Each structure stands twice: as C-alpha cells, then as structure tokens.
C-alpha cells in the first residue's frame, strides 16, 4: 500500500524544535537498534508512492569514529543505487557530526540567511554561502566537498546523553524526502519503544 510522505518543514525554528523533541530521542541506541531501525526505514521507503520512491542507500553509524565511521547498518532499498550515493552519505554524515543537527536543518539555516534573494536565486547561492559562512576549505576545488547540506542526514540522540551518538543517512530520494522519511520513521520507532 502506498503511503506518501508529508512535506518536510522548511522553517529552521520548527526543524530545530523537531530535532530536540522527545519524540526523536532514543532511550538507548545499539547495533540491534540500528538494525531494526534500518529495516523499518527500508520498509517505509518501499511503501512510498512511485512519485516519491527511488532507489536509496540507508546508512546508520555510531558517531565520533574518526577517520572512518563505525557503520552498524547499511543497505540499498532496491536495485538502482550508485557509488555516488555512498559519497552523499559520507558528506551528509560529516555535516551532522560537525554541527550536531540534520543536514536539512543546516541547509534551511543557510537559506534563511540569504533572505533578500528570490527563491530560485537563493537555491543557486546556498552552497557558496555555506562555504563562505564556515570558511570551508575545498580539497577538490568544488564547493563544500567534505560536507553536504542536502536533506537526509539526521542525528541520533539518546535520552540523558549530551551530543550526537550516531547518524542516520538516507541518500537517493529527493532531498526533502530523504529528510522526512528519516524523521517520520524515527518518530514511529521511538514511539513504539516508549
């Protein structure tokens, strides 16, 4: 049965409140939690209507593992993902770990700072504004090549623990849907565990 996603919020204030809400705080988070959550994400993505559904890569890692993350769950939802999805996962994860918020919230904050520009112009300018705001160095000459401010990277937070303990990333859907499918699935998952 097709279950469409509601639109993701674009308001940084609303997004900040959502990310600090008890509805997305895990009571604990282990490899078993990641496995069960990852399968729930896969099922949710496969339930999307064809207008929203695309092959996607789901990756869940424990935070703070440098230089490489400790990936505790990863899978493609269906045939059709490509190696570039892995790059997007890496960059979205880096954004969440550095700033402690979702990659979608980072994008919306940068866009809010470009308020004087019209919608289409703001979207064109967002990557450059991000690089300038945080004085990011680009190893390949491209804008923000270590980070991605596109929806889909989401922090794992645990009740009673300060900071981010892990990162959930979806890559392959439209960026707002990458974000929204994680938020919706985490809320349902945490609600079932409460």
Predicted regions and their residues:
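Ordered alpha/beta subdomains of enzyme catalytic regions
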Residues: 22-24, 94, 173
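Extended hydrophobic
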Residues: 129-190
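Long, compositionally biased interface segments
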Residues: 192-194
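Sparse, context-dependent recognition of short Cys/His-centered cofactor- or disulfide-binding micro-motifs
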Residues: 26, 43, 84, 89-90, ...
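Structured interaction and signal-relay segments at domain junctions
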Residues: 46-137
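Intrinsically disordered, low-complexity terminal regulatory regions
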Residues: 1-83
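A generic signature of intrinsically disordered, low-complexity regions enriched in glycine/proline
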Residues: 15, 88-89, 182
């Amino acid at each position: 049965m097709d279950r469409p996603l509601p639109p993701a919020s674009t308001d940084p204030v609303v997004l900040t409140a959502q990310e600090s809400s008890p509805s997305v705080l895990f009571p604990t988070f282990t490899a078993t939690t990641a496995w069960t959550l990852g399968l729930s994400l896969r099922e949710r993505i496969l339930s999307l209507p064809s207008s929203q559904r695309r092959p996607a890569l789901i990756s869940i890692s424990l935070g703070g593992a440098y230089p490489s993350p400790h990936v505790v769950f990863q899978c493609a939802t269906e045939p059709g993902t490509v190696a570039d999805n892995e790059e997007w996962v890496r960059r979205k994860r880096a954004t969440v770990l550095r700033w402690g918020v979702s990659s979608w919230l980072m994008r919306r904050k940068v866009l809010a700072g470009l308020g004087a520009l019209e919608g289409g112009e703001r979207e064109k300018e967002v990557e450059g504004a991000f690089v300038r705001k945080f004085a990011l160095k680009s190893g390949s000459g491209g804008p923000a090549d270590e980070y991605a401010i596109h929806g889909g990277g989401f922090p794992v937070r645990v009740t009673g623990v300060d900071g981010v303990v892990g990162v959930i990333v979806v890559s392959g859907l439209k960026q707002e849907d990458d974000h929204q499918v994680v938020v919706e699935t985490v809320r349902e998952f945490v609600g079932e565990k409460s």
